[in-house]
UniProtKB/Swiss-Prot annotation:
UniProt similarity note: Belongs to the leguminous lectin family.
Signal sequence interval, chain numbering: 1-23
Residues engaged in binding Mn(2+): 144, 146, 155, 160
Gene3D superfamilies found in the cross-reference section: 2.60.120.200
This protein's name: Galactose-binding lectin
Anything else known: Binds one manganese (or another transition metal) ion and one calcium ion. The metal ions are essential for the saccharide-binding and cell-agglutinating activities.
Residues forming coiled coils: none
């Protein structure tokens, strides 16, 4: 092979290898407020967009109200071609307000579900949080901010943050001090290398609540999912559930170590020929 051809082949293989090393699929968005006509957001159930740009998830005048908001575009959280799983970081703020003559219920859940997710047909009663049937079962992974203790779902006796996997009977919970009218800021991180879902909840007085749990998203969810929020109320339990802001970034490496190694071997063989 002529020297120029050797150099050109070497250069192209090197470029291809470098591209594969850096190849990733990224989804990123940021909502400081919301509007009803935004095509990037899907609404389900009793959602209302307020004039101040907040999303109110439930209808206070309706028994067993359920409302959900989702990012409209599906996100690929793992690859069937490579087996790789995405890592993600999301931050959001919300507010829950008690109302007169009702128990404060039932809370908000940040959830991940199949891309065709809808409010479950049997999702009545506040304890379902709009993501499960009346037995507590569904197809989702979520972080719940629960303000009502439902004994049928083994809730602890206090307000709590819980990590849910296909059920509102949480796999792990920690106590949390929910304050009516307080703006709560949350950061959720999923580290695909350790399969760990970590959550930090900051109340407006500076108190921080943390919780973490190993969750294999590839084993629990399909390749393409949607991210969103849901809330629900019941006959005697209602409160105002507001989503104020939301940012999100996910990264899925789209190449395998094997494909990178193969290119590197080709480069070394060409260099030694």
């Amino acid at each position: 092979m002529k020297p120029f051809c050797v150099f050109l082949t070497f250069f192209l293989l090197l470029a291809a290898s470098s591209k594969k090393v850096d190849s990733a699929e990224t989804v990123s968005f940021n909502f400081n407020s919301f509007s009803e006509g935004n095509p990037a957001i899907n609404f389900q159930g009793d959602v209302t967009v307020l004039s101040n740009g907040n999303i109110q998830l439930t209808n206070l005048n309706k028994v067993n109200s359920v409302g959900r908001v989702l990012y409209a575009m599906p996100v690929r959280i793992w690859s069937s071609a490579t087996g790789n799983v995405a890592s993600f970081l999301t931050s959001f703020s919300f507010e829950m307000k008690d109302i007169k003559d009702y128990d404060p219920a039932d809370g908000i859940i940040f959830f991940i579900a199949p891309e065709d997710t809808q409010i479950p047909a049997g999702s009545i009663g506040g304890g379902t949080l709009g993501v499960s049937d009346t037995k507590g079962a569904g197809h989702f992974v979520g972080v719940e901010f629960d303000t009502y203790s439902n004994s049928e779902y083994n809730d602890p006796p206090t307000d709590h943050v819980g990590i849910d996997v296909n059920s509102v009977d949480s796999v792990k919970t920690v106590p949390w001090n929910s304050v009516s009218g307080a703006v709560v800021k949350v950061t959720v991180i999923y580290d695909s290398s350790t399969k760990t879902l970590s959550v930090a909840v900051t109340n407006d007085n500076g108190d921080i609540t943390t919780i973490a749990q190993v969750v294999d998203l590839k084993a629990k969810l399909p390749e393409r999912v949607k991210f969103g929020f849901s809330a629900s109320g019941s006959l005697g339990g209602r409160q105002i559930h507001l989503i104020r802001s939301w940012s999100f970034t996910s990264t899925l490496i789209t190449t395998t170590r094997r494909s990178i190694d193969n290119n590197e071997k080709k480069i070394m063989n060409m260099a030694s020929a």
